[in-house]
Amino acid sequence: MSDSLWHLYLLRTTSGMLYTGITTDVARRLTQHQAGKGAKALRGKGELALVFHCEAGDRSTALKLEYRVKQLSKQQKEKLVMNQPSSLVSLLDVRTD
């Protein structure tokens, strides 16, 4: 599993909330979320739309990217959705301290 390629994804709920997650299989994970078997934060939120996904490398890098994206403001996340960058590695280069 450590050799697997991980992906970062954003889902939008019917209320407009953006959910960020990581997985090795975006289609499988979306199906799990839609069946109510994914994150508790999405249960009962209605239809989910996959609005962004990109390759994130190995699990360690994916976890770091997920953390960075979750720290972004809603406006910054909306920019990601609008611009659809193929990579988010540049987020790892930004220092917050």
Curated annotation (Swiss-Prot):
InterPro entries, sorted: GIY-YIG_endonuc, GIY-YIG_endonuc_sf, UPF0213_domain, UPF0213_GIY-YIG_endonuc
| PROSITE patterns (UniProt xref) | GIY_YIG (PS50164)
Q: What's one Pfam family the UniProt record gives for this protein?
A: GIY-YIG
Where in the numbering of this chain does the GIY-YIG domain appear?
4-79
Leader sequence range is: none
Protein family according to the UniProt entry: Belongs to the UPF0213 family.
Q: What is this protein called?
A: UPF0213 protein YE0453
Q: Which organism is it from?
A: Yersinia enterocolitica serotype O:8 / biotype 1B (strain NCTC 13174 / 8081)
